[in-house]
């Protein structure tokens, strides 16, 4: 990738997700499109364009893929979720601007559990919302603040094999963990540059062992933790050379 609007080029790519075939989907935010690549990085297809119609976007952000390889996209500027098949054909959408149940304000990260329920970081409302696969509202939790279960601009979401929900709480410089019903389990992190500290944690991903990978835009690095938040390792520094980062965002495993 490089900066631009051609196939395989990006302007502010945000999140990525990987389907059952190993293909990589990227939300190319400022080009208002989704791009798809094979495991070797070869361009396969794209869809989108600026607008508010079906299949159009205003700053696509979070991505999630269900067990049928349908693609869920948080359409941040349109305050909605859109769903597509693997080829980019529009299937459905839900959401409207507001703070009521099922309404959204700047939706960001997405996570999908084993039952197909969709978890959304409703960033502007400082909460998480949960929907069934058809977009019907199920539950919500969170409010503005820095206490347990409160948020200051929740960013990315990831769900482990037990259904626990991990959220990067960007403005509070921490990660919070909840069960599937929204009950607070644990949190870790504070503002700083040491091991286990964060400056604006962004992307989250969980591997098959339950280890948690967190990208930080402020420290230009990736940190890895065990499921209980114990620091394991890190890599990255600011730059454009191989292995260096500049405002790292989404991750995929």
Identify the residue ranges that each predicted region occupies:
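Eukaryotic scaffold repeat domains enriched in small/polar residues
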Residues: 1-253
């Amino acid at each position: 990738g490089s900066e631009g609007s051609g196939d395989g080029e990006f302007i502010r790519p945000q999140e990525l997700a990987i389907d059952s075939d190993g293909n990589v989907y990227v939300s190319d935010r400022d080009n208002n499109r989704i791009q798809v690549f094979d495991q070797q990085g070869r361009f396969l297809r794209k869809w989108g364009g600026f607008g508010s119609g079906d299949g159009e976007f205003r700053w696509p952000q979070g991505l999630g893929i269900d067990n049928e390889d349908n693609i869920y996209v948080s359409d941040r500027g349109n305050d909605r979720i859109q769903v597509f098949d693997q080829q980019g054909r529009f299937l459905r959408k839900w959401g409207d601007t507001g703070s009521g149940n099922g309404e959204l304000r700047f939706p960001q990260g997405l996570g999908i559990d084993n039952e197909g329920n969709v978890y959304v970081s409703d960033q502007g409302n400082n909460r998480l919302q949960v929907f069934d696969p058809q977009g019907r509202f199920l539950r919500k939790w969170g409010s503005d603040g820095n206490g347990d279960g409160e948020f200051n601009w929740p960013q990315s979401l990831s769900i482990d094999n037990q259904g626990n929900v991990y959220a990067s709480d960007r403005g509070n410089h921490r990660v919070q963990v909840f069960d599937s019903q929204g009950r607070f389990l644990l949190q870790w992190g504070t503002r700083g540059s040491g091991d286990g500290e964060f400056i604006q944690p962004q992307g989250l991903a969980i591997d098959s062992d339950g280890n948690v990978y967190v990208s930080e835009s402020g420290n230009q690095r990736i940190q890895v933790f065990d499921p209980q938040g114990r620091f394991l390792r890190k890599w990255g520094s600011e730059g454009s050379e191989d292995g260096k980062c500049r405002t790292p965002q989404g991750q995929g495993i």
